[in-house]
Structure formats: structure tokens, C-alpha cells
Amino acid sequence: MWGGSKLSSSGSRFLGALRSGFQSTQVDSSRLTTSAVYPKNQLSWILQIKPWVFNENRIMWFKSYSITFACLNWMKSYRLPWTRPYSTSRTTVDKNEMKTFLALAHRWWDEQGVYAPLHSMNDLRVPFIRDNLLRTVATHQPGKPLSGMKILDVGCGGGLLTEPLGRLGASVIGIDPVDENIKTAQHHKSFDPVLDKRIEYRTCSLEEIVKDTVETFDAVVASEVVEHVIDLETFIQCCFQVLKPDGSLFITTINKTQLSYALGIVFSEQIAGIVPKGTHTWEKFVSPEKLESILESNGLSVQTVVGMLYNPFSGYWHWSENTSLNYAAHALKSSLQEQPAPAEFALKGEAEELQAEASTNSGVQEDLKK
């Protein structure tokens, strides 16, 4: 077969000559032959060109051209994640998820309602945040251990976690893209004058406040949030940018395993009705291995990953060594200027995620019996 460039140019000349022949009034179309267009030594291979071959090669050439320039543009715009300028045109907010939480905005503080598991989770996540933050400071004030710290609560909802952090002495900013959630949170904190001073709520997404809050917070909390965002990489990059050097990032979320699908979606949403249907999307769940890879590649060093299990019959959470369902993670932002290159973690990828999905061992059944 002839090369694509030669075939394409010769085919174009041949078709162009035919068009000019049919349009000309001086040349009789019945007498027009290929010998009038090409010398004899070229006829042997020109006549072998078939229309489908020409079209196929033209399509292949166009695709390769497009892919090549797309790759070049990507390489040209790429920068290291911690130095890449952020664009607010990229969003982490899923509008469909917003509709789900908008319908439930008035039920945040019903401790026996759909958010009962989140109320109960405070028994684990508040001490988890407090204890890990205290390891980063030399001294603290009794009764107000987080006094002097500034914390960002991303996806704060009605303020279920924001208020306990404020009671520990921290200055907390809670953000949520659903305005009705923020109104509920503001109304609830207004009953406590102390919290009213320590807590501030804003209706916005994380990426919308990055520009004005670079290296502002001692800690960023994203509890039960990352399984709802549409761009986890961008989300983690924003967390990195708003953290002070040596700042802490706290995440609680759901592992991406077959067990988490069976219990977190099928049982919890469709059978038991513990949470409303459509609250979670299994494709957005993230394994600890994948989350750690994203964190490390964006300048955040993972310190702790620990499993959590919820007993729907008792309504209580407890810690577990097994991370097949829910888990909590704590990462620190490095204070060094030079960060680890993303290439070091690029090979972790899918292999680790597949291993995580197979980690539904017998320890889960033992923990669920407790």
C-alpha cells in the first residue's frame, strides 16, 4: 500500500482534474480520460486507488493530526500541581448532587432523621480531628484545645461538624454550594452567641475561595464530601492551596469495593432506607490507595488511614482496622518548597484500586457483630 501523503495528494489531483473536466465547455466529457491528466508511467498505480481506501486513509490522517496537536497542547499547558494556576472555570460541584441535598436542607438537625448517621459519626470524627491537630502544636488551652486555629469545613451542610469544632475553640469557616444548607446552618448557630462569633458560613464552592484564601487555614475538613465531587484531583489541589505549610487535611469517605456497593447503596438506600435513594454514586467512591496516590502527588503526606463501621441497629460508629466500607484519612501539607514529583506515584493507578476492591475479608463480619 502507498504512503498516506502520496495517496492523498494524488487522489486530490485526480478528483480535481475530473471536476475541472466536467465544468469545462471546451473539453468533451466523453473524451476525458486519465491519460489526459497523468503521464502513462503514473497510470499503473493511480488506477489502483479505490474510493474506500482514499476515504479510510483521509480519516486516519485527520485523527492522527488531531490527537497529535491535542497532546502537544496538553504538554504545553501542564505544570506541577502545586504551581499550576487555578482556573475557576473548572468546578468540583455536581449539580445533580446539589438537587438531592437541597430537598433535604431542612432536615439536618433532626437527630433521628436521614442525617442520624452523620450526627452519630461526630463521636469518631471530632476526636479524630482534635487529637491529630494537637500533635502538631506544642501547647494548648484546657477546655479550648483548638483555640487560635483556623479551620475550613468544606461541604459543611447544616453545620453538624462545624459547630463541634467551634466549641473546641477553633475559628471555623463552613462553605457549601447549596444556599438552603447555609441558611439552616446560620439559623442553628444563632442560638449560641459564642458559636455565632467563632463560625462563619458562606454559600460557595471550594474553588471559588481559593484565590482569596491561599495558605490561610491550619486545617481543612472534607467529611463525607469527596464521594460527591466530580473532579477529585482539582478538589485536592484546592485543599493544598488554602492550607498553611504543615497544615492538616482531614477526609472521611467511602471505599470503592463490592461490599461498599452492597451495604452503602443497595442496603442503606434501597432496602433499609437509612439514607435517601440517590444520595451516593458508586462510581465516585474512592479507595484509600487511590486517594493516597492523589494526595501524595499533590504535596500532601498521608499520616493516618483508619476504617470506620456503622451499626444500623445500634446507630453507633466504631473504629476498625478494615477499610472496606468507610474510612478516615489525615494528611499533612509539607512545609518544604520542593515537593515530590507526580511521576513517582503515577504507576500506583488501577492495580492498587483492584486490590482494594478485593479486600472484603472476614474481618468485616467480625466488626459488624460488635
From Swiss-Prot:
Q: Which residues carry this modification: N6-acetyllysine?
A: 144, 150, 197
UniProt entry keywords in alphabetical sequence: Acetylation, Magnesium, Membrane, Metal-binding, Methyltransferase, Mitochondrion, Mitochondrion inner membrane, S-adenosyl-L-methionine, Transferase, Transit peptide, Ubiquinone biosynthesis
The record's subcellular locations are: Mitochondrion inner membrane
Task: Give a Gene Ontology cellular component term annotated to this protein.
Answer: extrinsic component of mitochondrial inner membrane
Kindly indicate whether the keyword Transit peptide belongs to this entry.
Answer: yes
Q: Which Gene3D superfamilies match?
A: Vaccinia Virus protein VP39
**Where is the transit peptide, renumbered to this chain?**
1-86
Which is one GO molecular function term here? Answer: polyprenyldihydroxybenzoate methyltransferase activity
At the top level, the lineage of the source is Eukaryota
State the needed cofactors, names only.
Mg(2+)
Q: Name one Pfam family in it.
A: Methyltransf_23
**What biological processes does GO assign it?**
methylation; ubiquinone biosynthetic process
Q: Which SUPFAM superfamilies match?
A: S-adenosyl-L-methionine-dependent methyltransferases
Q: Where does S-adenosyl-L-methionine bind?
A: 125, 155, 176, 223
Q: Which residues bind Mg(2+)?
A: 224, 227-228
Indicate how the chain sits in the lipid bilayer. Answer: Peripheral membrane protein
Task: Give me the reactions it catalyses.
Answer: 3,4-dihydroxy-5-(all-trans-decaprenyl)benzoate + S-adenosyl-L-methionine = 4-hydroxy-3-methoxy-5-(all-trans-decaprenyl)benzoate + S-adenosyl-L-homocysteine + H(+); a 3-demethylubiquinone + S-adenosyl-L-methionine = a ubiquinone + S-adenosyl-L-homocysteine; 3-demethylubiquinol-10 + S-adenosyl-L-methionine = ubiquinol-10 + S-adenosyl-L-homocysteine + H(+)
Pathway(s) annotated for this protein in UniProt:
Cofactor biosynthesis; ubiquinone biosynthesis
Q: What is its EC number?
A: 2.1.1.64, 2.1.1.-, 2.1.1.114
Family, similarity comment: Belongs to the class I-like SAM-binding methyltransferase superfamily. UbiG/COQ3 family.
Record text on subunit structure and interactions: Component of a multi-subunit COQ enzyme complex, composed of at least COQ3, COQ4, COQ5, COQ6, COQ7 and COQ9.
> What job does the chain carry out?
O-methyltransferase required for two non-consecutive steps during ubiquinone biosynthesis. Catalyzes the 2 O-methylation of 3,4-dihydroxy-5-(all-trans-decaprenyl)benzoic acid into 4-hydroxy-3-methoxy-5-(all-trans-decaprenyl)benzoic acid. Also catalyzes the last step of ubiquinone biosynthesis by mediating methylation of 3-demethylubiquinone into ubiquinone. Also able to mediate the methylation of 3-demethylubiquinol-10 into ubiquinol-10.
Protein name per Swiss-Prot or TrEMBL: Ubiquinone biosynthesis O-methyltransferase, mitochondrial
Could you tell me the gene encoding this protein?
COQ3
